[in-house]
């Protein structure tokens, strides 16, 4: 915040580091700083923001310092959507991703939003996953049963479910619909 404010107040030179890595603490992360200057103040630094995620992964790999999956701008799970209400929102906004997200994923080299399945998932989350497997005619009670199992297994696992786990649940609930 101090670095962004310094530029807003006229500073022409600032020091930042990729992912904020460096000696001690308090280094301004380049990605967050550049993106804030661009989106909040309209200041184009000339830095290619589409490389941010790639560079952050490279720096994490070379430095051995792992970055949190939920790290702002470059986190691997930044565009994962687990919450059922947000999954519904993402489904309904189409290409207008600036409604549920502060910036488009391609601006920082991220992939498009991905609906994931976990304890916070909702009916639309399950319906989206079913649709991805060609099941578009599931009844509400079937989706509810699948959702209950998704939530239970996610809580037991303490994490998100993968495609194999989801299909296992679907086979149990609606066995005649999955190969």
Which residue stretches match the model-derived regions?
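Catalytic cores of alpha/beta
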Residues: 1-11
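Generic signal for short, ordered secondary-structure residues
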Residues: 12, 38, 108-109
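A mid-to-C-terminal "edge-of-domain" accessory segment
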Residues: 42-179
């Amino acid at each position: 915040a101090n670095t962004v404010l310094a530029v807003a107040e006229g500073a022409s030179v600032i020091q930042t580091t990729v992912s904020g890595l460096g000696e001690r603490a308090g280094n301004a992360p380049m990605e967050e700083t550049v993106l804030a200057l661009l989106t909040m103040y309209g200041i184009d630094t000339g830095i290619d923001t589409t490389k941010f995620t790639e560079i952050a992964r490279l720096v994490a790999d070379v430095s051995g310092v792992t970055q949190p999956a939920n790290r702002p701008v470059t986190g691997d799970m930044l565009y994962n959507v687990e919450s059922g209400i947000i999954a519904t929102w993402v489904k309904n906004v189409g290409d207008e991703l600036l409604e549920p997200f502060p910036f488009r994923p391609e601006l920082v080299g991220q992939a498009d939003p991905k609906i994931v399945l976990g304890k916070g998932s909702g009916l639309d989350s399950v319906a989206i996953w079913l649709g991805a497997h060609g099941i578009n005619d599931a009844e509400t009670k079937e989706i509810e049963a699948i959702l209950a199992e998704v939530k239970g297994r996610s809580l037991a696992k303490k994490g998100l479910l993968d495609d194999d786990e989801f299909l296992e649940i679907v086979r149990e609930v609606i066995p005649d619909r999955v190969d």
